[in-house]
Structures are given as C-alpha cells and as structure tokens.
Amino acid sequence: MTKILFMGRKRLSANLLRLLSSQNGIEIVGVLTDSHLQGSPTTAAAKELGLPLYTFDTALEAMKEGRLKYDLGLSVLYWRKLRDEFLTIPSLGTINFHPALLPEYKGTGGY
C-alpha cells in the first residue's frame, strides 16, 4: 500500500483526489490544501472522503513529530513552494504537476 500526502487546490486537484482515493493499493493519509481560501474544491473533496486536512504548518509539525508518515508526496496545482521536508521525508519523493510551461507561466494562475 502506497501512502500519499496529497497537496492541491482547484477543481482538477479535487477530481484527481477523488480518483486516487478509489484506487487499490493507494492510501491518502492527508490532504494539504488552501487554508486561506473559502470554498476550496480540494478541501470539500477531502471532507467528503473523510480524509485528514492539513495546513502547511500543521503538516510540517505532524511530519516532525512522526504523526504524518507517507511514501509519496503528490502536488497538483498546489499554490505554495514546498520546503525541503516535503521533498526529502517521503521515501519515494514528491511529484509536482503544473500544467503550464515553466518558468514562463509560473505562479498560481499562470495557465
């Protein structure tokens, strides 16, 4: 079973979260999403699926305390630059999906 920390925002992320949560061999151990926005589609999907929600800071704290352990980080349209802990702690690393050319279309709404 691959344990995933899902990081995302927007509708595409929410749809992917729903798809991943239904797959055999995958366990979503937490969802890191927009703590500063009301009505985040990813937050709504996580609540609908009964998945633990984290802010950037609460995820870091849980990782450092050993309460949040995962094999793979998956960032899909996540708005914030990740700190080293998010890249080095998971045994399989972290994958980032950004649907636009970088660096030309960097940022949260560059596509």
Predicted regions and their residues:
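One-carbon transfer enzymes
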Residues: 1-111
